[in-house]
Amino acid sequence: MGSQSSKAPRGDVTAEEAAGASPAKANGQENGHVKSNGDLTPKGEGESPPVNGTDEAAGATGDAIEPAPPSQGAEAKGDAPPKETPKKKKKFSFKKPFKLSGLSFKRNRKEGGGDSSASSPTEEEQEQGEIGACSEEGTAPEGKAAATPESQEPQAKGAEAGAACKGGDTEEEAGPPAEPSTPSGPESGPTPAGAEQNE
């Protein structure tokens, strides 16, 4: 829709005369745009685009140079997929050593709440869980046994559990811890267990 004032509606009347004659266009606007005649200089003289457009072409080449960083960004995007694959590998490698080494039975339960490996742990994980339980059982009752001489049976059980965890014979491991913690020296390992049963 071209401006109606640019068309000469009657004979020799030009757009400038029509704009000057109209009271609505007295502010120098023509169809919503400010008219500029030779007396008025544009606000941004240095930033005004040239009429012939030669500098715009140079600016376009400058713009063509500027897309080079986005092409570097494309290379960065090319680098991004290898970065994504290590992330996938990290997830895979994190789970895989977890299953093989069985680092912590408790941690496996926390982490794999919905995972099938948590509901049915492997043999190694079960062994690790037993060892963890044995070490907890072995340390707590032994500490109590050292404090009170009456709890010698739990100490023996703790020593046996510790021996079972270490894979050694229960008799060898149970004997030495029971002897130093007993108040009376002549008592042997099996005798304190029988004494507690009588109590």
UniProtKB/Swiss-Prot annotation:
Annotated region (Effector domain involved in lipid-binding and calmodulin-binding), positions in chain: 87-110
User: In UniProt terms, what function does this protein have?
Assistant: Controls cell movement by regulating actin cytoskeleton homeostasis and filopodium and lamellipodium formation. When unphosphorylated, induces cell migration. When phosphorylated by MAPK8, induces actin bundles formation and stabilization, thereby reducing actin plasticity, hence restricting cell movement, including neuronal migration. May be involved in coupling the protein kinase C and calmodulin signal transduction systems.
Q: Look up and give the organism this protein is from.
A: Oryctolagus cuniculus
Phosphoserine modifications at: 22, 36, 48, 71, 93, 101, 104, 119-120, 135, 151
Provide the membrane topology annotation. Lipid-anchor
Locate the Phosphothreonine modifications and list their residues.
14, 85, 148, 170, 182, 191
Q: Where would you find this protein in the cell? A: Cytoplasm, Cytoskeleton; Cell membrane
Which PANTHER family is this protein grouped with?
A: MARCKS-RELATED PROTEIN, MYRISTOYLATED ALANINE-RICH C-KINASE SUBSTRATE MARCKS
Per the record, which residues fall in region Disordered? 1-199
Taking the first listed entry, what is the main subcellular location of this protein, grouped into a coarse class?
cytoplasm
**Molecular function (Gene Ontology), one example:** actin filament binding
- Specify one Pfam family: MARCKS
Triggers of expression: Up-regulated in alveolar macrophages in response to bacterial lipopolysaccharide (LPS).
Name of the protein described by the UniProt record: MARCKS-related protein
Compositionally biased spans, kind Low complexity: 16-26, 53-64, 156-167, 181-199
Q: How does it assemble?
A: Binds to filamentous actin (F-actin), but not to monomeric G-actin, independently of its phosphorylation status. Interacts with calmodulin.
Q: Name one GO cellular component term.
A: cytoplasm
Residues carrying lipid (N-myristoyl glycine): 2
Q: Where is the composition biased (Basic and acidic residues)?
A: 76-85
